[in-house]
Structure formats: structure tokens, C-alpha cells
Amino acid sequence: MQPTHSVNCEPLKSLVRTVPDFPKPGILFYDITTLLKDRQGFAKLIDALAEHYIGKNIDLVLGIEARGFIFGPALAYRLNAGFVPVRKPRKLPARTVRVTYDLEYGSDTLEIHEDAIEPGQRIVLVDDLLATGGTMEATVKLVRQLGGEIAGLAFAVELDFLKGRERFPDLDVFSLLHYSE
């Protein structure tokens, strides 16, 4: 599904470096650091994400560790919303709620401060990349556990062939750069 917005993001693909056989043989890695260092490209990316959510009364943007921390604060600023980090275990100083989820080889855990979300707050969850959707699915569980209302899931890049968006049939999944292989 291609995004609908007035910022033409297709040229931004030329700023994304591809690295074959990383992190292991047979994987083509889409490296966004080359996009991030381009001030105009980064600004266009944030503007396009923000355009999708302006007027939707967003209270908070949640960024998932680690690269969600790059996009989250910038998006929150553009939406006049607060920013909340979703962290790996034992990184937050106050009381937290956590969710453990399965990975290809093992499991991982995410945490959020238990007072980070007030019931009914409208929230956008943001990460750099949508692949299989496992990390975002865990974050959705955290938000719902705290009573937040999910206004959308935002990604800079989506690997369409991994079908991660199929995990979220009832949510607004918004990705800017789509790759089919």
C-alpha cells in the first residue's frame, strides 16, 4: 500500500544505502544513516510523517529503541506532542511495565514507565523499519496495557515482502519508503 501525502518521498530512496550480506549472508540491509545525514532528506521524511498525523489530535509519540528515538522526538515536535521512549530492559529509572516477545532465535523484552501514558491518550508509535512486525506488535501491547489509544503506526521504511503490516489489520500503518525485495 503506497502512502498518500503531498511530500514526494520516492527521491529519498536514493539516499538510502543498500549493504549486501549484512548482518548475515543473503540479507540486503537498507541503511538509513545516509538518509539521516542529509538535512533536506531528513526534513522531508519528518515532514511527510507529520503531515499524515496533523489534525488527528496526537498526544504522544512513542519511539522504540533505538532508531525510533531518531524519528520520535522530531515527529513529536512537529505534532506538538510529547515523546515517550520504549526501552530495552533495565534502562528506565522508575517503575515499568514490560512485554516479552519472540524473535527468530530467542526472545526480547521492551519496557515503558508505568505512568508514561494516561488512559485515552492518542498515540503514534514510530520506528525506523517495518519488517515482520514483532517489535511493533509488542509495543502495541504495552500501549493497550496502559490504556492508550493507538492513532497510528509510523515507519520510515517498510519491507513489503515480509508482510509485517498484516499483524495490524485494524490499525493505521503508515510507511514512507517501500521495498518489495
Curated annotation (Swiss-Prot):
Enzyme class: transferase
Classification via InterPro entries: Ade_phspho_trans, PRibTrfase_dom, PRTase-like, UPRTase/APRTase
Pathway: Purine metabolism; AMP biosynthesis via salvage pathway; AMP from adenine: step 1/1
Domain of life, source organism: Bacteria
Catalytic activity entry: AMP + diphosphate = 5-phospho-alpha-D-ribose 1-diphosphate + adenine
Matching Pfam families: Pribosyltran
GO cellular component: cytoplasm
Keywords from the named record: Cytoplasm, Glycosyltransferase, Purine salvage, Transferase
Matching NCBIfam families: apt, PRK02304.1-2, PRK02304.1-3, PRK02304.1-5
Protein name per the record: Adenine phosphoribosyltransferase
Protein's organism: Acidobacterium capsulatum (strain ATCC 51196 / DSM 11244 / BCRC 80197 / JCM 7670 / NBRC 15755 / NCIMB 13165 / 161)
Gene name of the encoded protein: apt
